[in-house]
Regions:
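Catalytic histidine-centered segment of alpha/beta-hydrolase-like enzymes
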Residues: 259-262, 279, 283-298
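Short alpha-helix in the alpha/beta-hydrolase fold that links the catalytic acid
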Residues: 247, 261-270
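Acidic catalytic loop of the alpha/beta-hydrolase fold
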Residues: 226, 256-260
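Short beta-strand/loop motif that positions the catalytic acidic residue
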Residues: 245, 251-253, 257
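Alpha/beta-hydrolase-fold enzymes
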Residues: 84, 88, 102-213
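Gly/Ala-rich beta-loop-alpha elbow adjacent to hydrolase catalytic centers
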Residues: 94-103
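Short, surface-exposed "cap/lid" segments of acyl-processing enzymes
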Residues: 1-59
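Alpha/beta-hydrolase active-site loop
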Residues: 64-85
Length: 312
């Protein structure tokens, strides 16, 4: 586990620091690819003090890492470190995909523990392409249904191998690689676009192993039993209830997202108790949402405008 800090690139800096919670199965550099194609860089130039979690590549000895470890220990430790390092009492969290789900679980549990009278460390919550309702993940639910033996997979490997994760994601859009190659050929005369797409394509194949304990819980509690939406998801001794979340919430979604379809993500804004809540749909796909042309032209500016109003 690493916590990265990026220094703002301007003189006037917003008071509230930002912590980015990345996915468990992908490298975090999709949010900081290269100068000009970096959400982190964009936020720094706008005056935000940015921190980002890198969960690391789990080894065999990490096979028992669980949601409890991430939601009740590792993520809160990062929150506390950001606050102590920045000298502030509150922060904004931006969570991408599974990272957004981890942030939601922590936010719900932390809010429930504090009740309505105590303001916690979370000032704003931004989720990007975050699934909360597994009924909207039909392909994954079918594939990992009752006949799928996750215990055999984990007994053999400890953690879910990166290659297995990659094949699982590719199965959601079987002809995606062919379509992507055809699209690149059609844009071969536009070097900047080609280079951008190649960078994103390289990242999509750079998966990391899925911690075995977390995978077991995600398959059973999230995919099969849909515990978050049904109000039955317990992380350790704590219940994760979306209705406990009351902080300002922004959910950024991709119109053509095959990994987090709208049916799996739309309930987030509907189920929280926040009076200040907003959902923004951006044209494009799951990766393009955070690093493509649509991100640069639409998503990043929308994110910056929303955070700026709530970070004084």
């Amino acid at each position: 586990l690493k916590l990265h800090h990026f220094t703002p690139m301007c003189d006037e800096v917003y008071r509230v620091p930002v912590l980015i919670v990345t996915s468990l199965v992908n490298q975090p550099y999709i949010l900081d690819l290269v100068p000009g194609q970096s959400m982190v860089e964009f936020l720094l130039k706008k005056g935000f003090d940015v921190y980002m979690i890198e969960w690391g590549r789990p080894r065999k000895e990490h096979r028992n890492l669980s949601l409890e470890d991430h939601v009740l220990d590792r993520l809160p430790a990062c929150v506390n470190k950001v606050l102590s390092h920045s000298g502030e009492s509150q922060l904004s969290i931006i969570g991408y995909c599974v990272g957004g789900l981890l942030a939601v679980l922590w936010a719900a549990i932390d809010a429930a523990m504090r009740g309505k009278v105590s303001a916690g460390p979370l000032k704003n919550l931004v989720c990007m392409a975050t699934p909360v309702n597994s009924d909207g993940l039909e392909s994954l639910k079918t594939w990992m249904g009752p006949d799928f033996d996750e215990e055999a997979l984990l007994a053999e490997h400890g953690n879910v191998p990166a290659e297995w994760v990659q094949n699982a994601l590719r199965s959601l859009r079987p002809f995606g690689k062919v379509a992507g190659a055809a699209n690149l050929l059609n844009q071969a005369d536009q070097e900047a676009i080609v280079r951008s797409n190649l960078r994103m394509g390289k990242w999509e194949t750079d998966n990391i192993p899925f911690p075995g304990g977390v995978f077991r819980q995600m398959v059973n509690d999230f995919l099969r039993d849909n515990c978050l939406i049904n109000g039955r998801w317990k992380i350790g001794a704590y219940s994760a209830d979306l209705a406990a979340i009351r902080v300002p919430l922004l959910h950024l979604l991709a119109q053509d997202d095959h990994i987090t379809p709208y049916a799996s993500s739309r309930d987030l804004v509907q189920r929280v108790s926040s009076s200040d809540r907003e959902e923004v749909m951006i044209k494009g796909g799951h990766v393009g949402l955070v690093a493509g042309r649509g991100a640069q032209m639409r998503m990043w500016p929308a994110l910056e405008a929303w955070l700026a109003q709530r970070s004084a």
